[in-house]
Amino acid sequence: AHVEVPNSLY
């Protein structure tokens, strides 16, 4: 997968 700007991957 591709993530540009990870906000909150908690």
Curated annotation (Swiss-Prot):
Q: Which domain of life is it from?
A: Eukaryota
Q: Which UniProt keywords apply?
A: Cell wall, Secreted
Where is it predominantly found?
A: secreted
Where is the protein found, in the record's own terms? Secreted, Cell wall
Q: Which GO terms describe its cellular component?
A: extracellular region
Identification of the protein by name: 34 kDa cell wall protein
Please tell me the species this chain comes from. Nicotiana tabacum
Its lineage reads: Eukaryota, Viridiplantae, Streptophyta, Embryophyta, Tracheophyta
